[in-house]
Amino acid sequence: MQSLRPEQTRGLLEPERTKTLLPRESRAWEKPPHPACTKDWEAVEVGASSHDSDEKDLSSQETGLSQEWSSVEEDDESEGSQGFVEWSKAPQQTTIVLVVCVLFLFLVLTGMPMMFHI
């Protein structure tokens, strides 16, 4: 077993003093918060009109997003009017492979190879 230095054994025996063994920069929780993070949150109404440039940017982004959503919904409706949805081939192939594997295992486990040994 590895021998411990006296300060390490002291830390094991007295856990409340382990704080003194840590280097200063590793105790990040004791540091004051970063000055940029001290700004408090503000409550803003969604429909409120204001003269701040940040909120104008947000409202223009929101209208852009709503236009994108409306175009996506229109696309969904046009596909629904055709009456069918084109599925990819992967689920069908997976189902076929699964059925073949299950059939093969069933035949092997029930003794199909024994039929060839006359």
From Swiss-Prot:
Membrane topology recorded in Swiss-Prot or TrEMBL: Single-pass membrane protein
Q: Where is this region: Disordered?
A: 1-84
Q: Which GO terms describe its cellular component?
A: membrane
| Species this chain originates from | Homo sapiens (Human)
Basic and acidic residues biased stretches: 13-42
| Official protein name in the record | Small integral membrane protein 17
* Bilayer-crossing regions: 96-116
Gene from which the chain derives: SMIM17
Q: Which domain of life is it from?
A: Eukaryota
Q: Where in the cell is it found?
A: Membrane
Q: Does the keyword Transmembrane apply?
A: yes
Which UniProt keywords are listed? Membrane, Transmembrane, Transmembrane helix
